A protein has these predicted regions:
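Conserved interdomain linker/interface between the two RecA-like ATPase lobes of SF2 helicase motors
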Residues: 172-240
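A short beta-strand element within the Helicase C-terminal
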Residues: 292-317, 323-326, 330, 341-346
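Walker A/P-loop
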Residues: 14-38
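Acidic, glycine-rich low-complexity segments with interspersed aromatic residues
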Residues: 457, 471-482, 495-497, 609-718
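Conserved segment of the helicase C-terminal RecA-like domain
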Residues: 321-326, 330-364
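Conserved helicase ATPase core of P-loop NTP-dependent helicases/translocases
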Residues: 89-93, 112, 250-251, 261-300
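Long, largely alpha-helical accessory region at the distal end of helicase-like NTP-driven motors
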Residues: 228-229, 233-234, 245, 360-495, ...
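Post-DEXD/H (motif II) to motif III coupling segment of the RecA-like Helicase ATP-binding lobe
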Residues: 131-191
Length: 770
């Protein structure tokens, strides 16, 4: 049994009467529905108390799609048991058949709908179910009372308040998104090319609402040149061109025809027969009536099945990952003689270019580093045989857009939250966002939600009308502190200690160490235990202001130097009248920390709370290295030695700001790094003694490399951890210019490091690519 059949079978026989099938454009939702209906028709299970499936209604939004669906069902189910297939649309009025395929526009007419009894159909399928919040769909679904209703869509998420998941009782029969479909080889591979839109007189265009520019002869020639350069798969081109407006599509079609191409344009006003004829001319064999391209704005975003398309051209900005994916999907259906589809995306300096990597990857976490990696490495992070390439000028535009993008806005967080809530049918927990491809829930901790603090609770209290939990000011403050400092899941120790206190009403060092070893395989050192207590007793503060502000945010109190107990403040917070809501929020946060740790940080590097190739901030590093006090980024500078833990992190900003001291840190290759010391350091300085381990006390010093690609991004000041390294040879004296612009030089020394593990190739290329 197909997985979609199996899940639908379970839902169908559980007593539910609706479900949703989510499948990427091009993966064959219609065939999946046909096979599912056939499977259910062949079953004989009287115990489910549903009447046999004899009559089926398939509702679509265009006649052309109804015709294609009718043909697909007829192929799968056949007619050996008397099945008949008909169309109900503006041009067809077949009502007396066992399988009826109808357009929503015709069926929703009162004079048509009244001809059907509420129980006229046993099984109803709603295609493009994300439209089902519209009034016409509501009308039909309210009229009919089938045994079962199945919604089908590639994109159930909507930008309005309509909840598609609720309409289908939050029952998901099957879900496969674009990335998975490519992984499973269900789609035709695509070769995506991000191409610079036209410059006129060697100047980049700024106003892309300028109709004269959009339809200029120069732009037409530019598009044709690139289309010829990147070709297509098959005997002749069969392309779709998506434009910004109907007028642009019309004029560009006329101009392309002047270049011996055969094109037409279609709009929402085009008659069904005109659309059908155009599609047949595009998809068919070469001949006098054949078309090379159809130009449109959005009528081919969904539903229409044209497997023969071998080239898709985007002449409009990406404003929505959903629409981008829908339009990309027009070319992803497999067809005979078609090895791949070519995607040409003409990219100007648009503000929302950062949405392109989101759409191509299908990653809705909005993690900027993931976006950059796709732009830089493209093909290496796209599954299957598909490829992604950007021209350098385009790549720079998209990277700049990523730098400038705000990916933790209230609007974005609320949209992602609502999508997950709609899907689940309840208020999501923090752990729900990852498995349902939601935004990285850490972003909820990055904003202050009025007086509620920087936590998921703060977001819920401010924006979720169905949330009834209430915390005291101190509880909200404590939750905000835990979320901001430990919510990223880079270390589980603090979360485990809080959990131990909640579950046992108190705890001590011995019990905690036993639990840490038993549950996570971590042998707690004295330095780790000391650092945890400092962090949970308001003694490891980033600033003096924080210490004063958080003076009552104390979870444990030290007992001597080797033990601790629950702090009075935390004990009160766990036992006042709002403690139940507080504990629910704490447990949700703890579960999220464990989840994130398991996903990203559980492969600990040499018994340290660091994971190779993961990212860490200036704030993370002193804590995770178990330093006894926080050291600011300004004091750390490029490196800092801690004598208690015998650790020396080296922090490299690979893209320097223009006003930075001219440090020439660079990789020679994946194994060797050249780095400079701080200024006013000589080859016989203490820094050189430590780095080159010239004294016995420095023999076991751990020199740890952290590198980040971009220093200008205010949202993601994080460094890749690339492991331990060792200085080789000896310090080489150099003179570097001072920052004051006087040209005066100061002393420093150069170090050649050898990494103990070569930098992973994709990270190396991403960091070093200019």
């Amino acid at each position: 049994m197909r997985s979609s059949d199996k899940k639908l079978d379970e839902i169908y026989h559980s007593g539910q009467n609706r479900a949703l099938l989510i499948s990427a454009t091009g993966t064959g939702k219609t065939y999946a529905a046909a096979f599912s209906v056939k499977h259910l028709m062949e079953q004989k299970k009287p115990e489910h108390h549903k009447r046999p499936i004899k009559k089926v209604l398939f509702v679509v939004h265009r006649e052309q799609i109804a015709i294609q669906a009718k043909n697909s069902f007829a192929r799968v189910i056949g007619s050996e048991h008397g099945q008949t297939y008909g169309l109900l649309s503006g041009n067809h009025k077949d009502k007396e058949c066992t399988f009826l395929f109808s357009t929503i526009q015709t069926l929703s007419l009162d004079r048509i709908l009244k001809d059907f009894a509420p129980d006229a159909f046993d099984f109803i399928i709603i295609d493009e179910a994300h439209r089902s919040g519209a009034n016409s769909y509501d009308k039909i679904m309210a009229h009919f009372q089938p045994e079962f209703g199945l919604g089908m869509t590639a994109t159930p998420e909507r930008t309005d308040d309509k909840d598609v998941f609720k309409i289908f009782n939050h029952q998901i029969a099957y879900e496969i998104r674009l990335k998975d479909a490519l992984d499973y080889n269900l789609l035709c591979p695509f070769h995506y090319h991000g191409i610079s839109d036209l410059k006129i007189n060697n100047e980049e265009q700024k106003d892309f609402s300028n109709f004269a520019y959009l339809t200029s002869d120069e732009r037409v020639k530019h598009v044709l040149q690139k289309a010829e350069e990147f070709k297509f798969s098959g005997e002749r081109v069969k392309g779709l061109i998506f434009c910004s407006s109907v007028d642009e599509a019309k004029v560009l079609s006329e101009k392309l025809n002047q270049h011996n191409l055969r094109t037409t344009y279609l709009t929402g006003a085009s008659k069904p027969e005109a659309r059908l004829a155009a599609v047949d001319r595009l998809a068919g064999a070469d001949g006098p009536q054949a078309l090379d391209y159809i130009l449109t704005v959005d009528i081919f975003n969904e539903g229409v099945d044209i497997p023969e398309i071998n080239q898709v051209i985007f002449l409009r900005p990406t404003q929505s990952p959903i629409i981008f994916t829908q339009q990309l999907g027009r070319g992803l259906r497999k067809a005979a003689g078609k090895e791949y589809v070519v995607i040409l995306d003409f990219i100007a300096n648009y503000e929302k270019n950062y949405l392109i990597p989101v759409a191509l990857s299908g990653d809705n976490s909005y993690d900027k580093d993931s976006m950059r990696k796709l732009v830089m490495l493209g093909t290496k992070v796209i599954p299957g045989a598909s490829t992604v390439e950007f021209e350098k000028v385009v790549r720079d535009r998209v990277l700049e857009s990523i730098d400038n993008a705000r990916t933790n806005t209230v609007e974005l967080l609320r949209t992602s939250y609502q999508a997950i809530k709609n899907k689940l049918g309840r208020i999501p927990n923090l752990v729900d966002f990852y498995p349902h491809n939601g935004i990285d829930a850490v972003k909820f901790f990055e904003k202050k939600w009025a007086h509620y603090g920087s936590s998921y609770y703060g977001f819920l209290a401010k924006y979720e009308k169905d949330y009834t939990g209430k915390l005291s000011p101190l509880q909200a403050k404590m939750l905000s502190y835990l979320s901001g400092r430990f919510g990223n899941g880079k270390r589980v120790a603090e979360a485990l200690l809080i959990e131990s206190i909640i579950n046992n009403k108190n705890t001590n060092a011995d019990f905690f160490k036993e639990q840490l070893l038993k549950r996570f395989g971590i042998d707690a050192s004295d330095d780790l235990l000391k650092n945890i207590v400092l962090n949970l007793s308001n003694q490891f503060n980033l600033t003096g202001d924080q210490k004063e502000r958080n003076k009552d945010v104390v979870f444990v109190e030290p007992i001597g130097t080797e033990d601790f107990r629950i702090a009075d403040a935390f004990n009160r917070a766990l036992n006042d009248e709002t403690s139940s809501d507080f504990i629910v929020q704490l447990n949700d946060l703890i579960a999220f920390i464990y989840q994130r740790y398991d996903l990203r940080y559980s492969k600990r590097y040499r018994c340290m709370d660091l994971t190779l190739n993961e990212k860490y901030s200036y704030e993370d590093i002193p804590r995770l290295l178990n330093w006894s006090k926080y050291i600011s980024a300004q004091i750390i500078g490029g490196y800092r030695y801690d004598d208690e833990t015998n650790t020396l992190p080296v922090l490299v900003n690979y893209n320097k700001e223009d006003d930075a001291i001219a440090y020439e840190d660079h990789f020679e290759n994946e194994e060797y790094l050249i780095a400079l010391s701080k200024t006013n350091r000589k080859v016989d300085s203490k820094d050189a003694e430590i780095i080159f381990r010239k004294q016995p006390e420095y023999k076991n010093t751990k020199i740890l490399l952290f590198v980040r690609k971009n220093k200008n991004d205010s949202e993601t000041k994080t460094f890749y951890f690339l492991g331990e390294m060792n200085a080789i040879g000896g310090p080489e004296p150099v003179a570097v210019p001072k920052r004051d612009g006087t040209g005066e030089k100061v002393s420093a020394f150069k170090v050649r490091y050898r990494l103990e593990s070569n930098v992973r190739r994709d990270i190396y290329e991403y960091i070093t690519e200019s």
